Amino acid sequence: MRTEKIDKSIHNASLATPKQAFSQVLSETLKTGIIKSNLLAMAAGLSLALYVTGIPIGEKLPEILFAIFGSAFVIGAAGAFNNIYDRDIDAIMDRTKNRPTVTGRMQPANALVLGISLSLLGLLLLGVASPRAALFGFLGLFLYVVPYTMWSKRRTIYNTEIGSVGGAVPPLIGWAAISGDLVHPAIIGLFVVTVLWQMPHFYAIAIRRYDEYKAAKVPMLPVVKGFKRTFIQTNVYLVVLAASSFFFVSLSWFITIVALVLSLIWLTLSIAGYKRMEPKKWATLMFVFSLNYLTILFTVIIGFSLLSPLF
C-alpha cells in the first residue's frame, strides 16, 4: 500500500518537472544546506575542544580535516536516506515536491547506493580522526534515520524532540575528534543548547508550512495541538535554553553572556510577536531569529576558541 502511494505521488509530482544538472540533483539529494549548517556545529565542538585542551590547531590538522570530510559525508548520507524514505510525503508538500527522489531525477536505488557509500566512507574518515568521533557519527546517523525518519516523524507530536537528539550530535563529533573528555561542561552545554534550539526552530517551520504538513498527515505539534499550545511549548524551551547558557560559565563569561542575551532576545520576540502578529508571521519571525541565534553563537564560540590563545 505504501509503495503504491509513493509511486502515485511521485508520478503526479514529476509530470512538469524540468531537467536539472547532475550537480544540482546531487546537492538536493544530499541536502548540502543542512551539511553546511551541521559542519558549523561540528566546528564549534571541535574548536571548543582545541581551546579546552590547549592543543595548537596545527598539531591536530589531520584530525580536523578527517573530521570535516567525514562529518560532511555522514550528514549527506543521512539526507539521502531521508529523501528515499520520505519521498511519498515530499511529493505532497510544496517545499519538497521537487526533490530529485520525488521527480525521478534520482532513482531510490541510486540514492541508496550513494547513502551507503557515503556512510561507510564518512565513518572511516571519522575513525581515522578518532574512534569516538566515528562512534558519534554512527549514532547521529542511526538516530536521524531510524527513530526519527522511519518511526517518530509520522507517528507522534514528539517527533521533533526525538529528532533533536540526532540533530545535536555534530558538536559531539567535533569535540570527540580532539578530546576524550565527554563530561566537560562546555561540550555538555553545547549539546544541550543544540538540542533545545531545534524545538522552537522546527515548530516555526511547522506553522509556516501548516497546510502542507496537514495534507501530508505528518503530526507536527501545531497541526495536532494548535498554535496556542505550540506558542506555550516554544516559550518553555526558550526559558530552558536561556538557563542552559550557564553551562558555559566555566569556559567563558563572554560566551555565557552572548548565549544568554540571544536566548532572552528570542524569548522577548516570541512573547511580543505573538500578541501582535498572526501565527504565520510570528512563525516567520521565530524562524529567522533561530537561524541568527545559532549562526551568531557558533561563530562566537569558534572565534573565541581559536583566537583567545593568540592573546
From Swiss-Prot:
GO cellular component entries: plasma membrane
Matching PROSITE patterns: UBIA (PS00943)
Any GO MF annotation of the entry: protoheme IX farnesyltransferase activity
GO BP annotations, alphabetical order: heme O biosynthetic process
Pathways involved: Porphyrin-containing compound metabolism; heme O biosynthesis; heme O from protoheme: step 1/1
Disulfide cysteine pairs (residue numbers): none
EC numbers for this chain: 2.5.1.141
Domain of life: Bacteria
Compartments, as annotated in UniProt: Cell membrane
Keywords for this protein: Cell membrane, Heme biosynthesis, Membrane, Transferase, Transmembrane, Transmembrane helix
Membrane-spanning ranges: 39-59, 61-81, 111-131, 133-153, 162-182, 187-207, 246-266, 287-307
Group of enzyme by EC: transferase
Membrane topology: Multi-pass membrane protein
Note: Carbon 2 of the heme B porphyrin ring is defined according to the Fischer nomenclature.
Family statement drawn from the similarity comment of this UniProt entry: Belongs to the UbiA prenyltransferase family. Protoheme IX farnesyltransferase subfamily.
NCBIfam families: cyoE_ctaB
Role description: Converts heme B (protoheme IX) to heme O by substitution of the vinyl group on carbon 2 of heme B porphyrin ring with a hydroxyethyl farnesyl side group.
The protein's assembly and partners: Interacts with CtaA.
Name of the molecule in the record: Protoheme IX farnesyltransferase
Gene symbol of the encoding locus: ctaB
